[in-house]
């Protein structure tokens, strides 16, 4: 899915799902637009939905009953080492191991193990270098830019996609945000070659920056905050309108 996107100079959207309604909305929209899509599941959302097995079963049943024909991946977002194994067992098609908060050597060791496990089972895997700014499931990243040399080392493990910090942030971007570091992204692209790169924190990034990031190798863009805000706004308006529930 992502190799095709990189070759075609476009990016596939990952939209996080937090319940049945979100899952249905994402699947139906992807089908309507005839677009491949990645369903992202954080460990917090997985816990809320009573476990990764429940999520995998719900997605499969909904995919089949809705007659979805576009490519769909079920992907663990910002997974821990333990969470990756749980999702492998639950039937996810793709996992992300976020070891960016570990010392690099520990990140490398755990990534190496999980790449081997994922590929033995025919799953794709995303790894991260350089923590993404903001908070994700209680883990706070400072938003530093990744080291291109470290990115190459992780990419050479055979990961299917690489998330690298380039000044991007989870959640709302502050007014004084300096923007994406395209110099860093270009250097990472030069080091990793055909490796599809991932841009986390897609909400609020201007369209021109998105387009430039895609031109420099980004093939997957994650969106969650924008959906959270839209969902909250629509719910608030519905209740304030005094409609019967």
Task: Indicate where each model-derived feature is located.
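Generic N-terminal amphipathic, Lys/Arg-enriched alpha-helix
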Residues: 1-13, 245
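Alpha/beta enzyme core
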Residues: 1-4, 19-45, 50-69, 78-195, ...
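Metal-dependent phosphohydrolase cores
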Residues: 14, 206
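Glycine-rich beta-strand-to-loop/alpha-helix junction loops that act as flexible
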Residues: 199-203
